[in-house]
Swiss-Prot record:
Subcellular location: Cytoplasm
Tissue expression per record: Detected in muscle, heart, tongue, brain, lung, spleen, kidney and liver. Highest levels expressed in muscle and heart whereas lowest levels detected in liver (at protein level).
Cross-link Cysteinyl-selenocysteine (Cys-Sec) per UniProt, renumbered positions: C10-U13
Protein name in UniProt: Selenoprotein W
GO biological process: erythrocyte differentiation; response to lipopolysaccharide; response to stress
Purpose of the protein: Plays a role as a glutathione (GSH)-dependent antioxidant. May be involved in a redox-related process. May play a role in the myopathies of selenium deficiency.
Principal location class: cytoplasm
Subunit structure comment from the entry: Interacts with DPYSL2, PRDX1, YWHAB, YWHAG, HSP70 and HSP90.
UniProt keyword terms in alphabetical order: Antioxidant, Cytoplasm, Glutathionylation, Redox-active center, Selenocysteine
Family affiliation: Belongs to the SelWTH family. Selenoprotein W subfamily.
Pfam families (alphabetical): Rdx (PF10262)
Molecular-function annotations in GO: antioxidant activity
Length: 87
């Protein structure tokens, strides 16, 4: 069963490339195990929020910034592994 990863990002801020980069990296890490969807906001929000199985695990608005370091990526990997174990 695929784990749903949802990314809400600021479309008006031009964050789509950051979303696509994260999507590819996650797909490479978990081939055929994830259902990844992205939603760009039409207005300026500053969002880059990542939800794993409905739970917020990364929030730019909450102070996490972008998923731009290995430690931030590994935090997502850990959340996905936990969700896969429960599925």
């Amino acid at each position: 069963m695929a784990v749903v990863v949802r990314v809400v990002y600021c479309g008006a801020u031009g964050y789509k490339p950051k979303y696509l980069q994260l999507k590819k990296k996650l797909e490479d890490e978990f081939p055929s195990r994830l259902d990844i969807c992205g939603e760009g906001t039409p207005q300026v929000t500053g969002f880059f929020e990542v939800f794993v199985a409905g739970k917020l695990v990364h929030s730019k608005k909450g102070g996490d910034g972008y998923v731009d370091t290995e430690s931030k990526f590994l935090k997502l990997v850990a959340a996905i592994k936990a969700a896969l174990a429960q599925a």
